[in-house]
């Protein structure tokens, strides 16, 4: 059922509640430059510039005597700069605060903050942070009320605000550890000054981006992220023209692209949605629109309560022998229950596809008779998986899934459930003592960890195209549970360094019923030598572009009768170098639908 479709995207564009993308882009591009400048200025205050760093053990800098905390934070910052370089650290601190500001704004607008106190605005959305006026009444973990009184009495409003902001971020670590990690000492040290002034990053975020754009639309986080990176992406490609290859650190900026909403809906509905409906045709009336509903949707008269699958395409009539084969496959689908489904976006970016997979899974669970609360918990625990090489993107994808869960279940944050959405971890700097402690002389654990460590070396270079050996995952997780309350000196290093490796390995090793993704696009000319050599060795038939490498890989991630849906460069259909890929797809797999985007205007 191959369709060369024209104008399908226009259907969605006519009815979509349009975000002000120009405002979002204007803010995000400006915010990156502004935040890097502001955190760098804080560095100067502590005797740290790109060209010079004053003594790490100094008790005072520029005539200012350092507190014990400031001295410790400054030493941590200097150590990080010595390890990663000045520019990289300033970039990381800037985007850390950008991510947090964006997440806090989304949560306050949607009423998701557990404190129910706005961080940036008052109830009328004016730039008068409610958290300041309610400071002495706040119920936040870690809040020093005496310090609050002290700062209020001294009328140090800016200092009070920075303190409350840090306490709020650290308090959210309890429910959103994947987004609000405990702030590194130096990250806190470099929080910009004058956040309450006219023209600050926070004030501009409130003024430039309409409040409605944040409401029930977690994809705004993805747009912010893409636009924030746009200048860096331009720099990477400008360097590429001068034959400077794309480094491991710059692969995310060079390859990530936010997927338009209608394309996400089309891919997810016709893969995950199709798999379910083919096994459970009796619920079609619950999940698919009537002709009248589809007509209204297409003309822009959309009911906000309408969550049916408007991009689902019914199959055309098949040949008799094909119908026999499909009947056998559909028996397998019919035996599936919602909690058995496993779906993944292996190049998840900021989580747009994962967020819509969540919506589609909710409809599936509801049609099967689950309560909303049961469905949300099961989706997060059993169904949904996401991976990305970029820590920032994975953080935002994690946040998107958690916000979806909170949207459906207002008490979700209290349930202690965390999603399977991870930044791909690499094993380059594993602590040998932590490995020895974790394995504890157990030969099976030792063999498993040795294999995982070997296979995930330089994993951030290769991402989800790595092939990982299945292990006894239960035994590994049982050991993590065992050491959780241990007091051994290596316990922390094992949990911090080894658990992410095991989570990454398991996610890469298992098979899925549906794989949906928008892969990275990078021609072989842009690959650095290490990545190119790996691709040439492991994926020789599709080595010309990372997107076709991902095409081959995602097919192998599917169960025997699973679905893969992805966007890709059209040349794989035509040029001779992709002949083997075409033959493999035709002989070993089945094409259900194809949408040629070049025909869409």
Predicted regions and their residues:
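Single conserved hydrophobic/aromatic residue that forms the stacking wall/gate
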Residues: 1-15
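RNase H-like polynucleotidyl transferase catalytic core
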Residues: 592-600
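Polar low-complexity intrinsically disordered regions enriched in Ser/Thr and small residues
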Residues: 10-12, 145, 303, 466
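SAM-dependent methyltransferase catalytic region
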Residues: 242-249, 253-593
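Non-catalytic, mostly N-terminal accessory regions of nucleic-acid modification and defense proteins
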Residues: 13-283, 402-421, 426
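Intrinsically disordered, low-complexity segments enriched in small/polar residues
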Residues: 7, 60, 140, 176, ...
